[in-house]
Amino acid sequence: MVRGERMLCPAWLLALAVLCAAGSEVRAQCMEDARCRDLTTDENILDCIQLCRSDLTDETPVYPGESHLQPPSELEQTEVLVPLSPAALAPAEQMDPESSPQHEHKRSYSMEHFRWGKPVGRKRRPIKVYTNGVEEESTETLPAEMRRELATNEIDYPQEEGALNQQDKKDGSYKMSHFRWSSPPASKRYGGFMKSWDERSQKPLLTLFKNVINKEHQKKDQ
């Protein structure tokens, strides 16, 4: 029996500590009482627990209605605030840097199908065609079809064998003999309106004179 009473003492002490930890004001009132100062006997412990419990019920207001509509107690509020550590409240810039490259990689991959994303292939550079000696160096880079086109163009439009003399350049104007309209025949210039008197046919004038003479003779006869 004595052993059972000794085992009950730690349990009562633990319950008393929980009640005292519920509020600072309740703890102060409990410690001021003489029964709570002398905890050697079980009667004093039970009386102290009842005193602290009554003080705790007096301090906490009782709300009418269902229990789920009542405001949370201080213990529940502390339990809710403990999981919110400073690391969870830290801004996104102070997060682990290893997670940011993955986000950037996903973003770049998702932006590939837009116009400003990654290019699909290399841009084609314009092919430079040289008409002088540099062409021999660039023939290796040109495809076979381009070389054939250049060869046919050279055959169709051959260059003049000799350059113009310096005297011809000084004296006369430059003749564009390599163009189709450079030197048309005189009969086709300006649509044939600028023909000379000798080149034009004189038959219309002769018929005109004959008609005038015949009319004058007819008037005289009348």
UniProtKB/Swiss-Prot annotation:
Post-translational modifications reported in the UniProt record: Specific enzymatic cleavages at paired basic residues yield the different active peptides.
Annotated Pfam families: ACTH_domain, NPP, Op_neuropeptide
Record's GO cellular component terms: extracellular region
Residue ranges of the propeptide: 29-105
UniProt entry tagged with the keyword Acetylation: no
Signal recorded as keyword: yes
Signal sequence range: 1-28
Disulphide bridges, residue numbers: none
Any one of the GO BP annotations: neuropeptide signaling pathway
Keywords, in A-Z order: Cleavage on pair of basic residues, Endorphin, Hormone, Secreted, Signal
GO molecular function, one term: neuropeptide hormone activity
SMART domains in the cross-refs: ACTH_domain, NPP, Op_neuropeptide
Protein name stated in the entry: Pro-opiomelanocortin-1
Organism: Cyprinus carpio
Lineage, uppermost ranks: Eukaryota, Metazoa, Chordata, Craniata, Vertebrata
